[in-house]
Amino acid sequence: MISPDAARNVVGIIGNVISFGLFLAPVPTFWRICKRKDVEEFKADPYLATLLNCMLWVFYGIPVVHPNSILVVTINGIGLLVEGTYLLIFFLYSPNKKRLRMCAVLGVELVFMLAVILGVLLGAHTHEKRSMIVGILCVFFGSIMYFSPLTIMGKVIKTKSVEYMPFFLSLVCFLNGVCWTAYALIRFDIYVTIPNGLGALFGAIQLILYACYYRTTPKKTKAAKDVEMPSVVVSGTGAAAAAGGGNTGGGSVSVTVER
């Protein structure tokens, strides 16, 4: 019979694979930006938010905060690299006004992270306290990001059209939330359960809306249409297996869907 730790590891690895896929979801958007050498109306906000989320989860997973959390560090370390690449591309092809704003927000995030790191390491002297403080921050920012799909869901209900809510992306986000929620429940971790439970819930609602309104969606009037989805949180615990506790991957992605 499979042990709880082994089951948690398997679920965590699956969650990491799904999370990695979601981190790569905006690639078509940035491919378009590189080809046109212009960010057009796209905003850096979702990627800046994801960057902060990843930084918090990486800090949560290091041994001095939450021991044995190698998967949380690896998936969010990858997330930092991916989001950093997106932001570099965005910076290169943005007008000066957008560049200055992006740098200002990034500066605030770095100062905030420095304050969190110093405050936690100097003010909390046990793994439990450090995990609690950083975990609460991760839950807070992750939960806020999970509410962003409410806008697109409201638009679906108002227009009775799922034109701006791609089925595949909704399905993957639902599976991501379910996977990490299941992981968190194998060995209960409140900091992973809350944001991912919300993710599973909102993902399920999007799928229900899709089932209700896909038949009433009007035919496309253009050969191709670009849609910028609200941010999608990539949050989970990778083999908390490792963390004898948890591993958590976090992030949000804005994706352009070409139809």
Curated annotation (Swiss-Prot):
Question: Ranges in the Cytoplasmic compartment?
Answer: 31-45, 91-103, 153-165, 211-259
Which key words are in the record?
Cell membrane, Membrane, Repeat, Sugar transport, Transmembrane, Transmembrane helix, Transport
Asked if the keyword Signal belongs to this entry, the reply reads no
* Main subcellular localisation: membrane
**InterPro entries reported for this sequence:** SWEET, SWEET_rpt
Give the signal peptide as a residue range, or say none if absent.
Answer: none
Q: Which residues lie on this side of the membrane: Extracellular?
A: 1-9, 67-69, 125-131, 187-189
What the record says about family reads: Belongs to the SWEET sugar transporter family.
Instruction: Kindly state the subunit structure of this protein.
Output: Forms homooligomers and/or heterooligomers.
- For this entry, the protein name equals Bidirectional sugar transporter SWEET6a
| Organism, scientific name | Oryza sativa subsp. japonica
Q: Which gene encodes it?
A: SWEET6A
